[in-house]
Every structure is written in structure tokens, then in C-alpha cells.
Swiss-Prot record:
Catalytic activities: D-sedoheptulose 7-phosphate + D-glyceraldehyde 3-phosphate = D-erythrose 4-phosphate + beta-D-fructose 6-phosphate
EC number, UniProt record: 2.2.1.2
Coiled coil, from the record: none
Record-level GO BP terms: carbohydrate metabolic process; pentose-phosphate shunt
Function description: Transaldolase is important for the balance of metabolites in the pentose-phosphate pathway.
Family label: Belongs to the transaldolase family. Type 2 subfamily.
GO molecular function, one term: transaldolase activity
Primary gene name: tal
Protein name as catalogued: Transaldolase
UniProt entry tagged with the keyword Transferase: yes
Length: 325
């Protein structure tokens, strides 16, 4: 089994200088952030207070971006050896989630953030909404790596792949002299959210804590079958709430070839590199099991509800940061 990568779903300034380095020495190959993670870091960590005071008088979004960009740049530097040696070592930052339904503004923000950060191993996170597929295409076409996020349905994962791959094809066409130019091919991950499915549907399901795994397996099969190593499935929302499951449950159940799992710190600590790789189920096996657990209509409704809820949660977290600044 090859090309499995475990990333850390957490970022905070002082953490990057301490615990993060320890994680890197123990096999962590990347990191992700989102508005909720930055909200918790900026509003709860004292290290940001002096920085915020020095930035007073600026627009609140500008203050947020200076803080976030500084952390992302620091993480990118820590991860740079992995990027240049293994073509991994990415850190992700999300565009303003309030732009999720505006293609033009999303694309402009994504390019601006990438330019401001100015690190090759940064992925720009784009939510998988109808307005965003064109954004994913344009970023990949222009050599900017992408983390397509908030994927819940097979349809979303397919549309993400089509957009990302089309951009990748255009990038390659425009960079025929790739080796001479020393230009790196952009990478992409398609972030399939897992545990949120189970938390929503467990009360209606005939078997607990399986729907998220099966749904993620289905999306993974679709992505993996395309045989494009520069576009990987990433399993997100892999934290466990409560004590009914092992903290690393959603890591161990989704140890698949050419995939990424971004996990919270407690899940990483519980996992400790136990690489017992899984053989993905085939699609007919997945559908057979899913149909025994819950109806297709319930699953489809859950996909739509979870996407809407995920966007709303990130928008609220983003606005909470701005209000506090």
C-alpha cells in the first residue's frame, strides 16, 4: 500500500513552533485549517492579542488575513522539506466562506490569498458549491493547488474531479516545457466529510457509525478510478464526539491507497502510525450495505442538509472572528 498521507486538522501560532514539529517528526505530512479552527485559535490563544493591538485601525478582515496568512506561511515553511522531497507537505487556507455562491469574487479572493501567502505548498480551500467548480478549474489551470472542501455526495466529488482535472489538463498544455521551466504541477485534494454523516443519520440508521465510512468509500472509489495521482481523495471531519468509538476510528477505517486523512489532534495521538491498511469495498458492496442501513432518499437529503449546514457554520465562524476583532 502506498501514498497514504496523514495531515493535522489544526493550526495555531505557538503550536506550529512546538507540538507541530513533533508531529512532523512522527510522520504527519501536512495540515489543514478552516474558519472554525482559526476562530478558536485567534479568540482563545493569548499569543494573538499583541498582534491584534498593533493592527487596530485596519479593516477587521484585513486584520484577520494578516494573522491567518502569517500562520499559514509559518506552517508552509515547516512543511517545505516534505513538499520538496516527497511532493506532499501542504497547508490549506479557505477563502471567505461568505463568497461561496459568487464565482468571480471567489476566484479573485483565491488568487489574492495565494499571491499574499507566496508559498508553493499552499492549497486554497474552495467549498464544493455550484458557483465554485469554475473557480477550481481556473486555479488548477493557473498552477494553484486546490483543496475542494465540504463534499458530501458522489455527485459533488465527480464535479470536483471534472473541474480540477480539466484545469490540470490545461495547465499541462500550457507548460509543455515543464522540466525546463522548473514549474511544479499543482496538486488537489477532494475533501470528503465523514463523521458528520453519522452524527446526523445515526438516529435513523439500522447500524451505527457506518454511513459516513461507506459514503466516503464510494467517493474514494470514484476518484481513485480516474488514475490521476495529482488529485487525491481526502477524508475530513474524522474526529469522534463522545466515548462510544475509538478516537482514531475514522482514520483506521479509511486507510486507503493514494488518499489523505486530515484528523484532529486526539485522533492522531490515538492512531500513532498503526498502518493496518484497508481494502476499499467495491461499489456494489457499498450500495448493498447502505440500502440495508438507510434509504437512498434519506442519504440524498442528508447530503444537501450537511452542505448547507457546513457552509452556514463556516460563515458564522468567520463572522464571529470579524466581530471579535
Amino acid at each position: 500500500m502506498k501514498n497514504f498521507s496523514l495531515w493535522c486538522d489544526f493550526i495555531e501560532n505557538s503550536f506550529l513552533d512546538n507540538e507541530f514539529l513533533n508531529l512532523l517528526s512522527h510522520g504527519i505530512n501536512g495540515a489543514t485549517s478552516n474558519p472554525a479552527i482559526f476562530k478558536n485559535a485567534i479568540l482563545n490563544s493569548p499569543i494573538y492579542k499583541d498582534k491584534i493591538l498593533k493592527l487596530k485601525g485596519k479593516r477587521t478582515k484585513d486584520i484577520y488575513e494578516e494573522l491567518a496568512i502569517s500562520d499559514i506561511q509559518k506552517a508552509a515553511d515547516k512543511l517545505a522539506p516534505l513538499f520538496y522531497q516527497k511532493n506532499d507537505g501542504f497547508i490549506s487556507i479557505e477563502i471567505d466562506p461568505r463568497l461561496h455562491d459568487n464565482t468571480t469574487l471567489s476566484l479573485g479572493e483565491a488568487k489574492r490569498l495565494y499571491s499574499a501567502i507566496s508559498k508553493e505548498n499552499v492549497m486554497i480551500k474552495i467549498p464544493a458549491t455550484k458557483a465554485s467548480y469554475e473557480v477550481m478549474y481556473e486555479l488548477m489551470k493557473n498552477g494553484i493547488s486546490v483543496n475542494a472542501t465540504l463534499i458530501f455526495s458522489l455527485e459533488q466529488s465527480q464535479k470536483c474531479f471534472e473541474a480540477l482535472n480539466a484545469g490540470l489538463v490545461e495547465f499541462r498544455k500550457n507548460n509543455i516545457a515543464l522540466k525546463e521551466q522548473n514549474t511544479r504541477t499543482p496538486q488537489a485534494v477532494i475533501s470528503i466529510f465523514v463523521s458528520r454523516f453519522d452524527r446526523l443519520l445515526n438516529p435513523k440508521a439500522k447500524e451505527q457509525n457506518r454511513i459516513g465510512i461507506l459514503n466516503a468509500n464510494l467517493a474514494y472509489n470514484n476518484i481513485y478510478s480516474k488514475n490521476e495521482p495529482n488529485i487525491r481523495a481526502l477524508f475530513a471531519s474524522t474526529g469522534v464526539k463522545g466515548d462510544d468509538l475509538p478516537k482514531d476510528y475514522y482514520i483506521k477505517e479509511l486507510l486507503f491507497e493514494n488518499s489523505v486523512n486530515t484528523a484532529p489532534l486526539d485522533a492522531i495521538e490515538a492512531f500513532k502510525g498503526k498502518m493496518d491498511f484497508k481494502k476499499p469495498l467495491m461499489n456494489f458492496e457499498i450500495y448493498t450495505e447502505l440500502n440495508q442501513i438507510i434509504s437512498q432518499s434519506e442519504r440524498e437529503k442528508a447530503c444537501n442538509d450537511l452542505l448547507s449546514d457546513g457552509i452556514e457554520q463556516f460563515c458564522i465562524a468567520f463572522e464571529d472572528i470579524l466581530k471579535a476583532l
